[in-house]
Amino acid sequence: MTTLLETPGYSEKLHDSIEKKLSEYGWGEEAASLADFVLVMLSNGKTQTEINEELVDLIGSDFDTSFSLWLFNQIEELEKSKNASVESVSKIDEIDFIEKESTDKSQQSFSVPETSIQPQSSQTPNITSLREEKELPTGRVGQKLKLTSQKQRFNPMAASFNYSKSVMPAAKRALTQTQEVPLCKYADKCSRANCIFAHPTPAAAPGEGMVLSSEMCASGKECKAADCVKGHPSPATVTTLPPFMSMSTIPIPCKYKPCLNPACRFIHPTKSRNMTWRPPSKTEETSLSERSFAVNESEEQLHVPSV
């Protein structure tokens, strides 16, 4: 009873019905007030007998007790209509849910399959997998078959597994990672040709260059931007190749000092004379018989032992 009165719309309908019924009994002037009084008694949980007693005490003995019977019949009809509307709404929601679920399943079953990356036809979709997706039913059996086909497609031990496709994303991520290098504490005054830390741009004036980014500049030591804030190689790094070095020389400073490899292809500092290995100079070899004494042209002295 209380739930019905608290439901929006039903309490107003019951109030209007009570007011019309009281007007039929000849209490039209006080019908609105009596309807409010009846709703208060209903909200307090009064029974049919208790409502009759209250109205008889309020109106008098001429009160028609059939009103209470009509009142509870009206309440019963409103409750039935309310339950019917709730059931219809729940059925509509259930139908919408079932339709949505079936639509999602159909979309999943007819989804576009992944293409296989192959050297001979990189832009041609996998027609076999497309045919499998379209021929699979939408029931439980179809879902099991679809799951089985997906497992076979991504099974590394299967013959049709595309190894290059699974490896390429990881390699691509490794190549796209930015190289971060810490800043050299000597900045543009660094004298190490093989310094691995970041330095200011060589185009800036001495002491004015700044490194505000942990990325290395693509131009390297050839950077011409005075306001470049990326990292650069050491100012002592040799970037121009000596004339006697071949064009196949690798433009990276050699880590060995001095370098003793005559075929070394790395760059060596210009101030070092060990650009290429040279054998030590051969000195004139003299025999022991041709060696001279410490004092040349000295007279021989005879020492006679004393007796």
Swiss-Prot record:
GO biological process entries: nuclear mRNA surveillance; regulation of mRNA stability
Primary site of residence: nucleus
GO cellular component: cytoplasm; nuclear envelope; nucleus
Region of interest called Disordered, as start-end residue ranges on this chain: 102-135, 274-307
Zinc finger extent (C3H1-type): 178-202, 217-232, 254-268
GO MF annotation list: poly(A) binding; pre-mRNA binding; zinc ion binding
UniProt keyword terms in alphabetical order: Metal-binding, Nucleus, Repeat, Zinc, Zinc-finger
InterPro entries the UniProt entry points to: Nab2/ZC3H14, Nab2/ZC3H14_N_sf, Nab2_Znf4
Location in or out of the cell: Nucleus
One Pfam family linked to the record: Nab2-zf4
Chain intervals with Polar residues compositional bias: 105-129
The protein's role, per its UniProt record: RNA-binding protein involved in RNA processing. Acts as a regulator of mRNA stability: binds to mRNAs and pre-mRNAs, preventing their degradation. Involved in the biogenesis of circular RNAs (circRNAs) which are produced by back-splicing circularization of pre-mRNAs.
Family: Belongs to the ZC3H14 family.
Protein name as annotated: Nuclear polyadenylated RNA-binding protein nab2
Organism lineage string: Eukaryota, Fungi, Dikarya, Ascomycota, Taphrinomycotina
